[in-house]
Amino acid sequence: MPCCSHRSCREDPGTSESREMDPVAFEDVAVNFTQEEWTLLDISQKNLFREVMLETFRNLTSIGKKWSDQNIEYEYQNPRRSFRSLIEEKVNEIKEDSHCGETFTQVPDDRLNFQEKKASPEVKSCDSFVCAEVGIGNSSFNMSIRGDTGHKAYEYQEYGPKPYKCQQPKNKKAFRYRPSIRTQERDHTGEKPYACKVCGKTFIFHSSIRRHMVMHSGDGTYKCKFCGKAFHSFSLYLIHERTHTGEKPYECKQCGKSFTYSATLQIHERTHTGEKPYECSKCDKAFHSSSSYHRHERSHMGEKPYQCKECGKAFAYTSSLRRHERTHSGKKPYECKQYGEGLSYLISFQTHIRMNSGERPYKCKICGKGFYSAKSFQTHEKTHTGEKRYKCKQCGKAFNLSSSFRYHERIHTGEKPYECKQCGKAFRSASQLRVHGGTHTGEKPYECKECGKAFRSTSHLRVHGRTHTGEKPYECKECGKAFRYVKHLQIHERTEKHIRMPSGERPYKCSICEKGFYSAKSFQTHEKTHTGEKPYECNQCGKAFRCCNSLRYHERTHTGEKPYECKQCGKAFRSASHLRMHERTHTGEKPYECKQCGKAFSCASNLRKHGRTHTGEKPYECKQCGKAFRSASNLQMHERTHTGEKPYECKECEKAFCKFSSFQIHERKHRGEKPYECKHCGNGFTSAKILQIHARTHIGEKHYECKECGKAFNYFSSLHIHARTHMGEKPYECKDCGKAFS
């Protein structure tokens, strides 16, 4: 064999020239495909391959002469050009540029067939990298040249019968060999018989799993400096590196969104054009990408080949199994630097970041509402269309989302697959388990900026925020009542009251006072006013209540908690209803009007109480003295005259009161506060009632008349004293002389 005279063979490895020309074999930097694999690639995948190979050619410096970009583009744009002449031309270029002295014979026609995988025996080997690079029969070299712009790989071969046809109705491809048709059919069935033992990923081709295993073994020539993964080809290494650098060189011209791969961009562009080339033969549903189509096919087959070793749950995809396994391992690879919170899924992490920044990139065209994630936006869109695809077979209830439907089904089955490792308590959803976990750790990482209250989850913090903003985004279409939580709206819509309100029907009648009610629940609560049943007891003072809401409200009198604050004057209240009523003092709104006298009220309860002044109804009767009252609150205050209970104590003078209103008036005396001023004389008073009584002295009005003599008085107390003169009653006696006075 003649001595190789190429300069890279002759020069000393230590010279500067040899250091500059660091040899790289083309088979190391090219992606290797078999013919069967190539025929299964779609146009976008072939174009991606073409771009990668172009980049590889441009960067390749192992051959003494650079390959012209212009020529490369020309080869790709002319796929029908003679493959034989193309190979011979490249061989001649290399021969002319090198001086290795090797001879090359003409390559026979059958050696230029794509199925050939070994170099032609007529091509003599050479120890120099230039000769090794020729590799005419090598599939890596062949494939590097035959990238196309949309033409099928087999268009390069114009000869030979193709007896094997694909049986799929929408695929008319034909093949020369039976293995090729079997491989093609896997693309339709989704069959991937080759599974990786390390990560579980599956492949259609045996060659694909061999390439994939290089990443795990670390035997690849090109190792990633970020994660240590190894690759057998330089092009795959470059593409992988983008996952770390975040480089997205392919940008959508319509919306500006960027992508790591050109194939992904092409799939994305279909969302703008509406093109869905992959159609399901069973339900006619169409998809943008082949991967989405294959995933959908499994929904018809019911196939779930990937099973969790911990709980036995099965999944249709390996990615779903991997995500599920994190619920058992507790692994949270995505960490928020701002709050230090770990998240199991990338999509959850991205949504979490947007929630903290306030970014809502998904806008509803109908109502303008913004959303943090595409999934939330898609769910919201269904509220406008009314679409509910998932229907429960047991109760007929329908849902927008499959996840909501699955969660609902567990109510019927009683299934609670998420179990707390500390206390054994089980839950229907992973999110419920995560929130519950905070009860053991005591961790509440989400703090309200308004009041400092902390919560276990961001959703709880968001919902709490509405108590400060007063936001009630969920409104009943029937009665207009608004709610802070969608759950409360759903409960409201299911109530009998809501159903019967339009007709005015009140089928539940009290046998004692004959009052009517829309719902059984309201009726049962009312019955307790007659029976005196109070099952909810305060742990601090022992006071009992008819319903748990009343107990919760009462407990705030002990804690002093007033979470509902007026934005106009800063006054705080124990309940949202009290805040709403108070806000009407600023707006002057009085929506509840008496039909008999036209008097208006700021709250419904005051209208109801007022209505009894017309009817004379007093349904609340004292069991000790038989005295009756128009409202339950008046009865409760009266009962304290029998029990002697005075729960409201002044901290200044320790005087106690049975009524909260009396306690408030008393406190004003200590502060010197007199907010009610007389328009006639300018005098100030501690309460509105005292002002009303005083006003009578100016207008001469005397409401209280003696039935015995007809004398009239401004005040009830004056009439009461006067009445004693008729009865001869003198309750006040002097201790010194014994004289009595009325």
From Swiss-Prot:
Function statement: May be involved in transcriptional regulation.
Protein name: Zinc finger protein 700
Renumbered zinc finger spans (C2H2-type): 194-216, 222-244, 250-272, 278-300, 306-328, 362-384, 390-412, 418-440, 446-468, 474-502, 508-530, 536-558, 564-586, 592-614, 620-642, 648-670, 676-698, 704-726
The keyword Zinc-finger belongs to this UniProt entry's keyword annotation: yes
Name of a matching Pfam family: zf-C2H2
Molecular-function GO term, any one: zinc ion binding
Location, primary (coarse class): nucleus
Residues forming coiled coils: none
Location(s), subcellular: Nucleus
Organism for this UniProt entry: Homo sapiens (Human)
Name of the gene this protein is made from: ZNF700
Amino acid composition bias (Basic and acidic residues), ranges on this chain: 8-20
A GO biological-process term: regulation of transcription by RNA polymerase II
The organism's place on the tree of life at top rank: Eukaryota
Record keywords: DNA-binding, Metal-binding, Nucleus, Repeat, Transcription, Transcription regulation, Zinc, Zinc-finger
Family, similarity comment: Belongs to the krueppel C2H2-type zinc-finger protein family.
KRAB domain span: 24-104
Gene3D superfamilies: 6.10.140.140, Classic Zinc Finger
Region annotation (Disordered) ranges: 1-20
GO cellular component: nucleus
InterPro entries documented for this protein: KRAB, KRAB_dom_sf, Znf_C2H2-type, Znf_C2H2_sf, Znf_C2H2_type
